[in-house]
């Protein structure tokens, strides 16, 4: 599923799809933004709303409805030095600290700058080519 012409935070959505009951949301960032978990959370909410409507699911039933498992990835290639992989948590933005068992949403940020995440680049030559092109033009 993709959200046609859905805007959030003044940006158009990047890519989303459902494969093997997993809802993969992928976003590209060329500038560091600690609000990525919140952006992805909002985006996922829109996708789940669309999924419920398109599959004619009744949220008021007494039976648990099954939904795709979300996975949110951010591909980062900005100038700020960042680790190859980091997990950002939405709960870091909560005004009141949460305890165990409380809701959590994460963004898996993958640094796709040239020289980073070599295993990923070896598996995806298009991504590697993009990293090389960006490095040459920076």
What does each model-found stretch correspond to?
Residues 1-138:
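Elongated, amphipathic alpha-helical interaction scaffolds
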């Amino acid at each position: 599923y993709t959200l046609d012409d859905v805007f959030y935070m003044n940006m158009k959505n990047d890519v989303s799809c459902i494969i093997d009951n997993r809802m993969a949301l992928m976003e590209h960032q060329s500038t560091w933004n600690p609000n990525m978990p919140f952006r992805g959370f909002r985006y996922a909410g829109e996708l789940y709303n669309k999924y419920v409507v398109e599959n004619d699911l009744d949220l008021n039933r007494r039976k648990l409805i099954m939904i795709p498992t979300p996975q949110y990835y951010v591909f980062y290639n900005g100038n700020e030095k960042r680790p190859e992989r980091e997990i950002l948590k939405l709960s870091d933005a909560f005004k009141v600290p949460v305890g165990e068992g409380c809701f959590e949403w994460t963004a898996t940020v993958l640094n796709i700058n040239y020289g980073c995440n070599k295993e990923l680049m070896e598996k995806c030559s298009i991504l590697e080519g993009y990293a090389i092109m960006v490095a040459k033009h920076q």
